[in-house]
Amino acid sequence: MATIKDLIQLAQNEVGYLEKKTADTKYLYDKKANAGYNNYTKYAKELDDLGDFYNGKKNGYHWCDVFVDWLFVKTFGRKRGQELLNQPNKSTGAGVGFSKKFYQAEGRYYSSPEKGDQIFFRNSSGQMQHTGLVYDTDKTYVYTIEGNTSGGSSVIANGGAVCSKKYKLTNTSIDGYGRPKYTKAETGENVNPDKVLYTRYVSGVDYEGLVIHNTPGGPDTDKLLQVGTKVNVYQISGSWSRVGINQ
């Protein structure tokens, strides 16, 4: 299952991408080639190619929000990505103000950040102007990866690149944070704490997997972990392994 960690890793891999001066697919997938300021990107192309993701074609338009949407679709798949973004098919989600409203409608808009949030910025008139992905936060700063921006500490709403940035939490340009409704598994948390069990491998016609024992050498629990089940190995002693299993 994809997680916030995967989402952030994908975003970090895209840092340095430059928008293109033409829509020529020969260059869309090269980070640096054919750079220009006409807002053509692989992100908009791929979402446009889905046919009904947005209410119209978006390549050639401002793409900060398109970049965030692309990250979610690429990481979690289209269906789950749209659920996390609170966006229907043929949505207006390429617009920053509309994306904010999608979160607000679900009660998912907050004043303090968490990893995996979508950050929203406003201009001096209070209008939404820019957005990005939160990849970390501490007591002083929020750290972001943004599309259609440039380096530096100020908010750049149409800068032409994917950049890693940071802002003080008190920055008045920050309007708020949209928080996708991640499952515990998607946050990377264990669904339940590890239950410590003892196991050994038994081969033969009756078992093809790991038989669970509560103590080393004790009677089995009539539970079987099928081959391929992932466990956390804490200790190995002879033929016994002490493992944690998410149950």
Regions found by a protein language model. Give the residues of each.
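Beta-loop motif signature
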Residues: V191-N246
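N-terminal capping segments
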Residues: M1-T75
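...with weaker cross-activation on analogous glycine-rich loops/strands in unrelated enzymes
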Residues: R78-S153
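Aromatic- and glycine-rich peptidoglycan recognition patches
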Residues: A2-Q9, G107-R108, S125-V205, P219-D220
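Tryptophan-centric aromatic hotspots in well-structured domains and transmembrane helices
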Residues: W63-V66, W70, N123, S239, ...
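Short, polar loop/linker segments at the starts of domains and inter-domain junctions
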Residues: T22-L47, I156-S164, L210-V227
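A generic structural motif
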Residues: V73, F121-R122, Y135, G244-N246
